[in-house]
Amino acid sequence: ISHIAEASESRFVMEDWHNFGSDYDKTLMAWHERFNQAWPELSSRYSATFRRMFNYYLCACAGAFRARDIELWQVLFSRGVEGGIRVYR
């Protein structure tokens, strides 16, 4: 984090820094649920091996986000906006 701030401070203003990690866990689990609900329609195009691997990928990534082993950050930079940028969540 400090490297990003240090490298950008002479060029940009860091307006916002947001962690989406806990949201991405929920997103991955929603994709997992929708993928498996849609499997009857997808099964003619994808193998059972692909299904197992994709389920493993989605669940492993969701678990890593849940355990906070990985993070997803969005950093908003500007060249300087008078009054700053208001970010709504």
UniProtKB/Swiss-Prot annotation:
The keyword S-adenosyl-L-methionine applies. Its EC number is 2.1.1.79. It catalyses: a 1-acyl-2-(9Z)-enoyl-sn-glycero-3-phospholipid + S-adenosyl-L-methionine = a 1-acyl-2-(9-cyclopronane)-acyl-sn-glycero-3-phospholipid + S-adenosyl-L-homocysteine + H(+). Keywords: Cytoplasm, Lipid biosynthesis, Lipid metabolism, Methyltransferase, S-adenosyl-L-methionine, Transferase. It comes from the Bacteria. One of its GO terms (biological process) is methylation. Signal peptide: none annotated. The active site is at 61. One of its GO terms (molecular function) is cyclopropane-fatty-acyl-phospholipid synthase activity. It is found in: Cytoplasm. It is an enzyme of class 2 (transferase). GO terms for cellular component: cytoplasm. It holds the Pfam family CMAS. Coiled coil: none annotated. Belongs to the CFA/CMAS family. Transfers a methylene group from S-adenosyl-L-methionine to the cis double bond of an unsaturated fatty acid chain resulting in the replacement of the double bond with a methylene bridge. This is Cyclopropane-fatty-acyl-phospholipid synthase. It comes from Citrobacter freundii.
